[in-house]
Amino acid sequence: MAGYPPNPGSGYPYGGAGGYGAPPPPYGSSPAPSAPPYGAKPPKEGKTSSSSAPYYGGGGGYGAPPSTQPYGSGGGYGAPPSSQPYGAPYGAPPPSSAPYGAPGGYGSPFASLVPSAFPPGTDPNVVACFQAADRDGSGMIDDKELQSALSGYSQSFSLRTVHLLMYLFTNTNVRKIGPKEFTSVFYSLQNWRSIFERFDRDRSGKIDATELRDALLSLGYSVSPTVLDLLVSKFDKTGGKNKAIEYDNFIECCLTVKGLTEKFKEKDTAFSGSATFTYEAFMLTVLPFLIA
């Protein structure tokens, strides 16, 4: 992305375990014979359970075109793990670790953020950008400071998108981030910008439903046509008239899909594409994405 310093030579970009450009297969791209049929009887009262895979498509590697099979003819969502971590999307942290500086699981969304430091080899421009935003020298920057810092690199985001970024990279709603989280946000945005430009094939500054589907597949998320239509309608600034989304809304869309999928997989311990939540866990999972 124009104006961004290059990623560190150590390959720091957030979660790039397989090397940039080579993410694991999309979550749900292999058969899942153990998954119950769509529309299965819901669990007992007091629990909320997602249905098993209604209609999820398979996908290829990073940047690959959709499969020659009809969309959705691949394996069910929630397929058994391959040699890669179960469904780990491009840009995800190792499955054994919580987001930077955050406790794991479904703890309080207002838990304190653990102080952090810049990872070794962080680009000096990233350090300078953070320090310029950290006006009080506290070692933390808030939502408006992050918004201002990103705008210096031609990244104009709404506060809602900034709040989602902060939540996804800290797993808290304290709306402050430290050096390590800022570095992760910075390089993840750089990578997502590259993906957006890769799939904006007509260079319109927008991506349509087909381009969004391919972009999400490259990130490791295989969503059904119904979900895809909902995403486009939600994030299209014209209310669905253009049936296309711009870059800033693309980021918000990716953050929403990424966050909800990762929260779901924390409960899908049987790799079945189905999970059971208590009422409180369900509310704590969904509400941060609604009230960001």
From Swiss-Prot:
Coiled coil: none
Feature: compositional bias, Pro residues: 22-40
Location of the EF-hand domain: 121-156, 187-222
Claim: Zinc-finger is one of the keywords in the record: no
Induction (UniProt): Up-regulated in leaves of mycorrhizal plants upon arbuscular mycorrhizal (AM) symbioses with G.intraradices.
Binding site for Ca(2+) 1: D134, D136, S138, M140, E145
Chain segments carrying region Disordered: 1-80
UniProt feature, compositional bias: Gly residues: 12-21
Matches recorded under CDD domains: EFh_PEF_Group_I (cd16180)
Keywords for this protein: Calcium, Metal-binding, Repeat
Function: Potential calcium sensor.
Protein name: Calcium-binding protein CBP
Species per Swiss-Prot/TrEMBL record: Oryza sativa subsp. japonica
